[in-house]
A protein has these predicted regions:
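Short, small-residue-biased leader/transition segments that mark boundaries at the very start
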Residues: 1-4
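Domain-level detector of nuclease and nuclease-like folds
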Residues: 8-196
């Protein structure tokens, strides 16, 4: 419908039709394609430029993909809330070249590269309470965050050393996640509560 038309117009105006990000960057999905497989239409929406950021290729296909898989292992009958984002700290860089191999790309744009990526995750402890988050007490909820510096030298598989509290990620980013959830839930950082 109209929302998709607006997205495509926005995409053409702002992003241009580039061959790729400069050098070793890939188009890193923020909502993974593998998380939206119910219909072809839902899956195709993950390929909008507004759902992508320039990610180092080894980061995107390595530790980040591993983390995405770990989060999928925590799906349950109740809703699993996942918020993904990127952060631009001091010293972020940009990509710009205008060339892909020997091919000039006249529509290329300058693109800022994030310094960090994060995810914050929330769900019921039981996974099958049948309750909305707002109906749950603090003892019925669990939350965790993940904060990774954007670089290429991580091991290929995810490690719990990158786990943080949602509160920590709020402090880093200045965002407020899950505003109706009690603070004690957002202070949690207990990897053993999760399939990681």
């Amino acid at each position: 419908g109209d929302v998709y038309k607006r997205q495509m117009l926005y995409q053409a105006k702002v992003y241009g039709e580039t061959f790729c990000y400069y050098k070793d960057y890939s188009r890193g999905h923020q909502i993974p394609s593998a998380d939206r497989t119910a219909t072809d239409e839902l899956n195709s929406q993950t390929f909008y430029a507004s759902n992508m950021t320039p990610q180092n290729g080894d980061f995107n296909g390595g530790i980040w993909a591993s983390l995405e898989g770990k989060i999928r292992e925590n799906m349950c009958q109740d809703t699993l809330y996942v918020v993904t984002g990127c952060y631009f700290g001091n010293g972020y860089t940009t990509t710009y070249d205008g060339y892909y191999g020997n091919n000039a790309d006249p529509a290329s744009k300058i693109c800022p590269v994030p310094t960090h990526y994060f995810k914050v995750v929330l769900r019921t402890r039981s996974g099958n309470s049948g309750k909305a988050v707002g109906q749950c007490g603090s003892d019925e909820l669990k939350a965790i965050g993940f904060w990774l510096e954007h670089r290429n030298d991580y091991p290929q598989t995810f490690s719990t050393e990158y786990c943080k509290s949602v509160e920590y990620i709020e402090q880093q980013t200045g965002f407020t996640f899950f505003p109706s959830v009690p603070k004690e839930v957002k202070k949690q950082c207990t990897p053993s509560d999760w399939v990681l």
